[in-house]
């Protein structure tokens, strides 16, 4: 029974070896897939600077933010337009036909024997110009000439028939308490200007974010390409070991188990190559999306070859200097300051609304009457006929709860805006400190991972020499090959992470544009 079980186990092992050998045979499926020529794809080279410029020109997030920024300029014009003068003109024709029960200015005899008809026709034009003043008041200039005629049997009772009249009037209304003063009147213009400045820095912040994302993605493309080379080198080393083991097994100086171990390693590393190649394509698509090509181009298979190589030199960094630069240049600081200014303006306006409404109203006018239009104008401008008046209007809502509630609300908003500025400064300081530590740590990782890679190379070389003289096994060699590939990948990751950390630090200092000598207009 034990002998039969041993024979069965040997045959199962042999069958498994044959099947694995067929699958991994260079002339069959796995070897065929790896060695098969892929369809020709369009390849493009791209530098980091080119990627940044293309993103500035075409990125959708930047375009959306740019349009929003421009719309804030329109808000300023809308507020300023409230002080534009308004011209209006009104023309009318009226006819009145009424019965009379009495004489009209001696036009009829002392005794009325029947109803007398009063037929009056008038044509008038009113020209009006009005504008709001920066002091909070309003001025209105009105000119209203008219022509009036009555039926002939009554014409004797009038000096002129038809008669021409003209009225020229100037009216001024000026608040003295609520809504009085240039500062109060221009509150919403200043708020709109602050909002426009805020949106400009929101746009700048969006640009910096997109450029930082482009940089991060670009370095991930670099890592993916280099990582594929590591995976291919590991696969090649496993294939060479498999070929050597097969030759030794055929010569009878190596066991079948060593061949199986090498074949399993090849299969595993084929999978790693496939995954690494997919990672490249994924990162390339992410980078292309950030550059916003046309949809037709995005549908096509385009391979991007990065031209820039990651730096491995340590840049001198002063933590306090980095914090000062960030405080000076970060868009969020300007946004918080302008929001605080707008809150103060709104608070002052709300405080003004607590006052009673006291307005001065003054008017003066000239009148004229003539037999024709020219005569009417001359008499109108002669100054012989005039009117004027002045007065004060006072109103105050009892309790004034709405104004007091608004004022309290604006005070709270102002306190929140002030606290937000303090919070933003704290966040920037903490963010810069973390970014500086990350740069320093990642640079040290480069040194340590490089040392680990060198040691892994030496260990693999020594283990291969031991295998040649029969002092080691395939499993140990494969383990050291795997350790070397891992060490190489770790060094690549540390190098790319260091460059991403430099990008992150520039983003925290808001100096990303300076890296490319770019300025936003």
Regions picked out by a protein language model, each given a short descriptive name:
Residues 15-26:
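Bacterial N-terminal signal peptides
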Residues 31-122, 172-187, 191-193, 218, ...:
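Bacterial Sec-pathway N-terminal export signals of envelope proteins
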Residues 63-67, 80-81, 134-165, 177-201, ...:
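Sec/SRP-type N-terminal targeting helices
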Residues 64-79, 206-230, 240, 247, ...:
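Amphipathic alpha-helical coiled-coil segments
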Residues 164, 168, 176-177, 181-271, ...:
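Hydrophobic, small-residue-rich alpha-helical packing segments that form membrane-like cores
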């Amino acid at each position: 029974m034990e002998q039969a079980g041993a024979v069965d186990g040997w045959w199962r092992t042999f069958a498994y070896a044959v099947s694995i050998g067929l699958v991994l045979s260079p002339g069959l499926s796995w070897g065929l897939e790896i060695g098969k020529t892929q369809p020709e794809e369009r390849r493009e080279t791209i530098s980091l600077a080119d990627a940044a410029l293309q993103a500035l020109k075409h990125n959708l997030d930047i375009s959306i933010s740019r349009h929003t920024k421009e719309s804030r300029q329109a808000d300023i014009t809308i507020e300023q337009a409230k002080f534009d003068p308004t011209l209006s003109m009104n023309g009318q024709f009226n006819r009145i036909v009424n019965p009379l029960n009495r004489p009209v200015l001696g036009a009829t005899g002392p005794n009325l024997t029947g109803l007398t008809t009063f037929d009056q026709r008038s044509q008038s034009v009113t020209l009006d110009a009005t504008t709001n003043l920066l002091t909070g008041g309003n001025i209105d200039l009105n000119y209203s000439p008219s022509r009036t005629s009555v039926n002939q049997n009554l014409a004797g009772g009038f000096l002129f028939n038809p008669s021409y009249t003209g009225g020229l009037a100037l009216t001024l209304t000026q608040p003295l308490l609520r809504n009085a003063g240039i500062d109060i009147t221009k509150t919403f213009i200043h708020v709109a200007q602050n909002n426009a400045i805020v949106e400009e820095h929101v746009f700048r912040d969006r640009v910096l974010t997109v450029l930082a994302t482009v940089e991060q993605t670009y370095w991930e493309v670099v890592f993916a390409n280099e990582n594929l080379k590591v995976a291919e080198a590991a696969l090649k080393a496993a294939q060479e070991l498999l070929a050597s083991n097969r030759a030794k097994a055929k010569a009878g100086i190596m066991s079948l188990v060593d061949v199986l171990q090498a074949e399993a390693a090849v299969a595993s590393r084929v999978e790693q190559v496939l995954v690494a190649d997919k990672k490249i394509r994924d990162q390339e698509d992410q980078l292309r999306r950030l550059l916003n090509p046309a949809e037709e181009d995005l549908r096509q298979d385009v391979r991007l070859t990065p031209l820039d190589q990651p730096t491995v030199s340590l840049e001198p960094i002063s933590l306090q200097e980095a914090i000062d630069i960030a405080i000076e240049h970060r868009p969020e600081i300007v946004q918080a300051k302008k929001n605080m200014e707008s809150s103060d303006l709104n608070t002052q306006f709300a405080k003004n609304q607590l006052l009673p409404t006291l307005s001065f109203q003054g008017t003066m006018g000239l009148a004229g009457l003539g037999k024709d239009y020219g005569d009417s104008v001359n008499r109108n401008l002669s100054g012989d006929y005039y009117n004027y008046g002045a007065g004060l209007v006072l109103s105050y809502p009892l309790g004034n709860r709405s104004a007091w509630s608004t004022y309290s609300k604006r005070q709270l908003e102002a306190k929140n805006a002030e606290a937000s500025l303090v919070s933003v400064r704290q966040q920037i300081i903490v963010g810069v400190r973390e970014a500086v530590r990350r740069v320093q740590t990642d640079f040290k990782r480069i040194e340590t991972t490089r040392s680990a890679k060198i040691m892994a190379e030496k260990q693999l070389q020594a283990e291969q020499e031991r295998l040649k003289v029969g002092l080691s096994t395939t499993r140990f060699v494969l383990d050291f090959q795997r350790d070397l590939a891992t060490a190489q990948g770790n060094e690549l990751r540390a190098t790319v992470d260091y460059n991403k950390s430099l990008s992150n630090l520039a983003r925290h200092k808001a100096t990303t544009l300076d890296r490319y000598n770019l300025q936003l207009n």
